[in-house]
């Protein structure tokens, strides 16, 4: 009995296996090429180099290209090493100044809020200051009242002196002599009396201009109005 012969598949006629896609190929390539970070070589400075660098940084924080090259030649360092060191020192200096400023500002704020006495409330000092201010205000008001009273007293004294002055008495005497003139006197006596009265009026006018007081002006007007109808 013959067995059935299986069909043998040739390589040329056999179906091809499934090939990977381009995305899978790129993923495998990325997995194979894992990026390795290069560690930066840290420069180790000697004590002499650090001493020279710190001294130069205290005197000058920014160096020119020529100055950095000269300093690198003196210290047997590269230009990049000197430049990097100065950049790092400037950053450290700015950070230190900022932290120090924040500490000082916080200390000042806390010192202002703290009560130094610890026993008395804060408004007690304000009340005491207000009482002192009120006392000073009262003293100023009393002084101003005293000054006003002094000025009033001086004005009254000056008016009394003007009222009792010899100029006023002189005018009054001349007017009284004119008022006592008799109508039966001769014409020459009348003219002499009028001249005396005119001189008295001139004195009164000069006195009124000199003192410029309301009492003197009222007196002059009363005498001038009373004298005219009687002398005519």
Swiss-Prot record:
Pfam families noted in UniProt: Homeodomain
One term under GO cellular component: nucleus
Protein localization: Nucleus
GO biological process, one term: stem cell population maintenance
Sequence repeat locations: 123-127, 128-132, 133-137, 143-147, 148-152, 153-157, 158-162, 163-167
Sufficient for strong transactivation activity: region residues: 168-232
Composition bias, Basic and acidic residues: 1-10, 26-35
UniProt feature, compositional bias: Polar residues: 11-25
DNA-binding listed as a keyword: yes
PROSITE patterns per record: HOMEOBOX_1, HOMEOBOX_2
Region spans: Sufficient for transactivation activity: 123-167
Superkingdom of the organism of origin: Eukaryota
InterPro entries: Distal-less_Homeobox_TF (IPR050460), HD (IPR001356), Homeobox_CS (IPR017970), Homeodomain-like_sf (IPR009057)
PANTHER family xrefs: HOMEOBOX PROTEIN, HOMEOBOX PROTEIN NANOG-RELATED
Role, per record: Probable transcriptional regulator.
Similarity section: Belongs to the Nanog homeobox family.
Official protein name in the record: Putative homeobox protein NANOG2
Taxonomic classification: Eukaryota, Metazoa, Chordata, Craniata, Vertebrata
